Amino acid sequence: MFFCFNTLTKKTLKIMTLKNVSDLFENLIDETSKKSEIKIYQEFIQIITSLENKDLSENEIKSIETELDRMKLDSNSLNRGKYYKKALNDFKNYLKETYSLTTKGYYTQLYGGLGLSFGLLFGGAILSNLERSLGLSLGLIAGLVVGSIMGRNKDAQAKISGKTL
């Protein structure tokens, strides 16, 4: 019988720290000329900078860095714009679900969309006695206005409570 006792090498894990992620996206901005990709990278940098400026505990920072590491942001994908857009949306959802942190205008956008949906129903059902297209148009406008106002109020509450990035 032959036993092999090779020394086990310790695999070092490179955790994506907030600083590393910020540097990565700064480099990606320099490498690309596509405006859509630059916008995604700048939004990532803005979120990372906001997180660095927040008073987060050490465990929260480690959790965020682990999530960033799980996303494999340093991989070379063929379609960078699509890959990082999905990563950005996943990261925003993670921050929303885990820490209740939202980006600026999150609720305005969400409630505006809901307002459009309900405005369409309202315009079709209630205002249809005017003229079909006029009723729908007025319903959409009213729904958008009401939804946007509600969303802005919710965004203001999130900002006051410190839940906005």
Show which residues each predicted segment covers.
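Helix-termini ("caps") and immediately adjacent flexible loops/tails
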Residues: 2-117, 128-134, 148-165
